[in-house]
UniProtKB/Swiss-Prot annotation:
Protein family membership: Belongs to the TACO1 family.
Keyword Transcription regulation among UniProt keywords: yes
Cell compartment(s), UniProt: Cytoplasm
Organism lineage: Bacteria, Pseudomonadati, Pseudomonadota, Betaproteobacteria, Neisseriales
Species of provenance: Chromobacterium violaceum (strain ATCC 12472 / DSM 30191 / JCM 1249 / CCUG 213 / NBRC 12614 / NCIMB 9131 / NCTC 9757 / MK)
Name the UniProt record assigns to this protein: Probable transcriptional regulatory protein CV_3123
Primary localization: cytoplasm
Amino acid sequence: MAGHSKWANIQHRKGRQDAKRGKIFTRLIKEITVAAKMGGGDANMNPRLRLAVDKAKAESMPKDNIENAIKRGTGQLDGVDYVECRYEGYGIAGAAVMVDCLTDNKTRTVADVRHAFSKYGGNMGTDGCVAFQFKHCGYLVFAPGVDEDALMEAALEAGAEDVVSNDDGSIEVITGPYEFSDVKDALEAKGFKSEMGEVTMRAENETELSGDDAVRMQKLLDALEDLDDVQDVYTSAVIGE
């Protein structure tokens, strides 16, 4: 399957995320805690927890922090009781936006999210207004120059759903959300190391933005991502330089 290049846009957004590393540990700890609460403390039996722990290790989170977060989720240690909630809406030029939160106060969270939408030119919508535009999946990006045929064979053998060749030569391997870690491990065992990858909500159709619209949209996304209760922000917008 062929696709246009997402490489530059992914690098662009990853750079912004890396600039906010001060909040990354807090968000990862919350995700580990909730994952353990929902599916138990054994990462081998809990795909969501395994993803969260793998991500924490990739960010060099100390082992004790990870173990304590799991124990808070399973009730072995006292902790805050977080609730999952999702808010949907529209950004600049009607671009779809979905905001996933973990909070101990939904009243506060919905007010904060609504304020960010309103302040930066978006509109908060009703439940389900844009969720159908996104697919829950995992992806791994391999830099230009990788052996595409060998990667495709290894990826499909490992359980990947699709392999996408982009215009710039980069290759994306698409997986189911709960097969991501297994596919990643299988490819690494065969010498294929991805540049980046994650489980995400991916827009089925993208909204290309440039100029002033791109600037305004980025401000909205930044405002949402900066909220303490927000875990992830997904959008159909592709931000031009």
